[in-house]
Amino acid sequence: MKKEFSRVLLKNQSDEILILKDRPDTWNFPGGKQELGESALECAIREMKEELAVEITELEEIFTGPLVFDSIVWQGHFYFAKQAQGKVTLNEPNKIKGVQFIMRFEEVNFSPGLAPLFDYLARSDYLKLNKTNWK
C-alpha cells in the first residue's frame, strides 16, 4: 500500500503561515496520513478540523511528490487554503505540542524531508500572491 499524506498551508491576516509542532525537534504544517478510501483533498480538510478546529475550503494543491522521511518514501500532497473558518485550537494536545504563525520558514526547524517542497516554494511566488480569507 502506498503511503500518502496531506498538509495544509494557510495564512493569518498578517500574512504569517500556520505551523505546528508534532515532533520533538521539528515543526510541520497541519495535516496527516490519508485514511483508507480517502482522497488527498478529503484528508487535508479532515486533518485541519481534527487537529486545529479550523474548517477550510477552496483548497489549491500547490505541490505533490515523493518525499523521504526516515528512509521511507511517502507521497506528499500540499494544499493552500484560500478560505478558513474558526479559531485555531489545539484539539490533540497529546499529538501536537505547539502551534504558531511564522513569517519566514527559516525561523524554525523543519524536517529535511520537506526540502523538495521548500525548493519549489523558493522558486515560486505562490505564497506572496495568495491569501487566506478568514470568516
Q: Predicted regions: what is each one?
A:
Residues 16-17, 85-89:
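Short helix-loop capping/hinge motifs at secondary-structure junctions, enriched
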Residues 3, 12, 71-74, 94, ...:
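A generic fold-level signal
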Residues 1-17:
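Conserved N-terminal beta-strand and adjoining loop/helix that marks the start
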Residues 10-11, 19, 81, 101:
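Conserved hydrophobic "DFG−1" position in protein kinase catalytic cores
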